[in-house]
Amino acid sequence: MPQELLLQVLPEIATNELLLKDYLSKQIKVSPKEIQHISILKRSIDARQKAIKINLKVAIYLNGEAFQEHKIQLPQYPNVTNAQEVIVVGAGPAGLFAALQLIELGLKPIVIERGKDVRGRRRDLKAINVDHLVNEDSNYCFGEGGAGTYSDGKLYTRSKKRGDVTRILELLVAYGASEDILIEAHPHIGTNKLPQIIQDIREKIIECGGLVLFETRLTDILVKNNEVQGIVTQKGDTILANKIILATGHSARDIFELLDRKQIFIEAKPFALGVRAEHPQSLIDSIQYSCDYRGEHLPPAPYSIVKQVNGRGMYSFCMCPGGVIAPCATSPGEVVTNGWSPSKRDQATANSGIVIELKLEDFKPFAKFGALAGMEFQKSIEQKAWHLAGETQKVPAQRMIDFTQNKVSSDIPKTSYVPGTTSVEMGAVFPEFLTQILREGFTEFGKSMKGYLTNEAILHAPESRTSSPVRIPRDPLTYEHLQIKGLYPCGEGAGYAGGIISAAIDGEKCALMIKDSIGK
């Protein structure tokens, strides 16, 4: 049996196999030559003290002990060409992992995706960045892989209660992700690596007899006697099935409007909204690592911060070390920000959403929209930001200290946000109560993270798509919609996930529930 150890070591030891072997040999009092293999099981950074340490959990195999490298392999998928069909609406993580699970269970997924495949999306991303043109069906939110494909590929989830996180991570490794995601405390694939993984998943679905239909947008759900019968697409095609997984993501406003129009029960849901702050990565490194220079053995530093301000949570969201701010509008006439990092996180700046918890009462000015009140609140801020910044994909921007002092910034340096920025006093973008909380919150952040509150930091507005503004209620036991039999609201857009991993888990669960219902 291997010996398992928990230890703290210097970064230069953790990143050098020979130094680590030497260190461990002294810990267990054997010669380095007696150590056959070291498996790193978990890895995280402890930056609480000036002397930064790496936390490791390792398994040590000595000579003569049985060691066999664990090779992660794909499940044995059956061919489902002639199996019962299930419609999956949306090819984000919830939809794709639902499709894979359906195949494992012997069911045939028909995946429809309003956007283009990962390669086709790139042309539309260039158009929004360079030409300020928003394709309503193909953008940073819509298209193969969903919003996560081109917004970082973070795999961290706080909730272990949602399901088997390890299974999802191992499936991603089997489809090409680095095995590092299995051991890192905050695993991350990177926007440059994720598209190929997504493409490989799609090819497996097709190879097994499933269908994936791009540029195919849901325009109607066929319902009879409160049971689904199928769907209609924008092409006028009808696809019949009595099981539908609705995994359309947090930005599919037309789907929320369709459900509301058909009187399929939905409800407003609180979400969070604010700005995206960009700092020099070197500054964040110096704050987090308490040093002037990060060195070669440490990764670009992340940060996580939360404060209670006027009875509301204000916190960092989707923090991207060495990353880029992206334009994530899904319709003309609005601007939206988000962030992403390449796998090496090697860009010069760090960015993070800094957002405030909203309450249902905040949506009262939009009460006439009923369950869509939160969505209309969200939309109003995005449209106002678009107008204030010049009615292109430029975003309102302001230096951080200037914002806290209610001063328009005299100049805005070039940031990672490619379409560009316009100097705007952020108080004009947000309702007064949000502006006040943001101002007080940044001042408090500056007290907790010395150096964070600086005019080197540029705020971009708005960060508004943190989660869905609508929940599509479902039975907690069957996962079916409370009102419509055979309709399975799924993932982030339905209000049951927050990120790639939790969405993938929810997709698998919906597939399992469908199989269970068929067996009854």
How should each PLM-predicted stretch be described?
Residues 2-54, 58-150, 154-171, 175, ...:
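Residues forming the flavin
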